[in-house]
Curated annotation (Swiss-Prot):
Positions contributing to Zn(2+) binding: 427, 430, 445, 451
Chain residues that bind NAD(+): 43-47, 92-93, 124, 147, 182, 298, 322
Active site: 126
Domain BRCT: 625-704
CDD domains: BRCT_DNA_ligase_like (cd17748), LIGANc (cd00114)
Name the record gives this protein: DNA ligase
EC number(s) from the headed UniProt entry: 6.5.1.2
One cellular component (GO) term of this entry: cytosol
Record gene name: ligA
Statement: the UniProt record of this protein carries the keyword NAD: yes
Organism: Cereibacter sphaeroides (strain KD131 / KCTC 12085)
Keyword Cytoplasm set for record: no
Cofactor: Mg(2+); Mn(2+)
GO biological process, alphabetically ordered: DNA repair; DNA replication
Amino acid sequence: MQDERPVDQLTEAEAAAELARLAEAIEAANTAYHTHDAPQISDADYDALRLRNRAIEEQFPELRRSDSPSDRVGGALAEGFAKVRHEVRMLSLENAFDLAEVEDWIERIRRYLGHVGDLLFTAEPKIDGLSLSLRYEKGRLVQAATRGDGETGENVTENARTIADLPTELDGAPDLLEVRGEVYMSHEDFAALNGRQEAAGQRLFANPRNAAAGSLRQLDPAVTASRPLRFFAYAWGAHSEPLAATQHEAIARLAALGFTTNPLTRLCTGPEELLAQHAEIERQRAALGYDIDGVVYKVDDLALQRRLGFRASTPRWAIAHKFAAQLAWTQLEGIDVQVGRTGALSPVARLKPVTVGGVVVANATLHNEDYIAGRDSKGQEIRGGKDIRVGDWVQVYRAGDVIPKVADVDLDRRPEGAAPYRFPETCPECGSEAIREPGDSVRRCTGGLICPAQQVERLKHFVSRAAFDIEGLGAKQVEALWRDGWIRQPADIFELPNRYREGIQRLENREGWGRKSAENLFAAIEARRRIALHRLIFALGIRHVGETTATLLATHYGSWAAFEAAMTRAEVGAGPEWQDLLSIDGVGAVLATSLVTAFHQEAERAAVEALAAHLTVEDAEVRAPVASPVAGRIVVFTGTLEKMSRAEAKARAEALGAKVSGSVSARTDLVVAGPGAGSKAKQAAALGIETIDEDGWLRLIGDA
């Protein structure tokens, strides 16, 4: 991650642009890691992106995006598997990188809980594998699902049954029990698997995590059965009765039921003991025989876990304390520039292969032209101002067994005549001008849909899970059909049945296709001629428009006709349509500009009109409000709350549909005043606003 300008020095416009860039980068990283099992940046880079995103959101809360990465978990689902809705969400973890961040996490827990005595924690290795949820009913394994996006996963039940240390029957378990853990592959088994792959002339796996993920997600369970997968249990989801009263007792119960649990799990009393266990696990890391990338700390008392609850994508009661990165020196042999869906030009370092932490790596991210030149996007020096040139000896690091980043340059070993790298000002794919807008850290191709790279990437986005989700038409099929000229824009997908069902060129005659698979695809395409408005808006692939934003836009405009008309009439920066767009909660000037600009570009407009001609777009659903006595009301808490912390009260109110404000105004509906309430209570009385005490609040919401 490049050195960035301090968050407290950003202007509001710079912060908005930075949040947009971070959202795009994090979404791309999530898709590469969770969906394709082919990560493109290191764990450390990914963590840095999320940390900076969170820091900017905290500094500029009014700029928080409706599709904020802080609210997202995992990635899109792989093709070919049935979908499973998780009864209890599978969330990710907050990360810490040093003792200070661990202590801050503990202090936040204490503040949230209010009056609490000594806290106990468990510490366990963070396994670097693929998360899996196992559902047992009456002691029998009935379903296994990957995490997916946290809400919906992939059904891999038959594959999971082939894992040797995963029990298919339990004796003495609750009638319903979801056991969660990590599928992984040992170093020894990974080496043997790659040996067999090499002998058979097949592709080698980059690391054990990719091997485990790829093996579990095989469409043929026989292939999974031939792979030496293992499973550690460490958590649970839905259950008909509690496993125990504490985390460590629950883990012991899982072990008694026949699951493999990690023997390095320990009970700790505070930050010093947690740090000592972190150091001990890191000391043993090289000899464990499997990959870990940190230590997970959890509040031990399950009653406190329930009180602490969850944020949008992480539990408050757990955190992952990550290990430091691993370093190596190698030579930079070349720089390639790739073009993404939104036209971003991304430089990739081609390295002389080097082993870093036991994995051979040959590529690294170079982020953007500023990073190569030795400065951040604001012009401040990084790496002491040292630029990166082809032929340089560079220090690379990896954290999490993925493609590394370039951390430093050895000027003493720079070859004579090595020239400064000139970043292209035209697109390497289509030759269009590549421009860099103010506040943006990347250069982008202006070719739009005439750019081949953007065409194919946007087509992949169009058929993705949250967009049109056309069964049988995934990224690989899109690439092949695009390469042969069968599809160039989304509308072409809906022409496939007419063009390639009969005649000389038939889909069923293509490699990898047959009559049945072709007819199945044609049927899936026909089924998608009717589409929900929010899916269509998201599928257009307009920069900055994520799933949540698409839903907000659909809800606001109601119909495709209204949305299209508004975008067509809108002018950037002025007019009633522009003001109406900005009035949507979560839509800022950057996002609005992107939307309006897209609908005014000739090629984009033509593609949208061609697509719409094939579709029946369903109007947005009007969601029923949350049924509670405080739904839709603006609530203010003031004074000391004695039965719950302020944070706990806020979370409960918001869960019931209320909006919690920090100040009293004429728009306030209700003030909850505890002992010591001062000016806010007086202001509420002056305005005639209903005011109740904490007991009254608890009675109102039914928690008394």
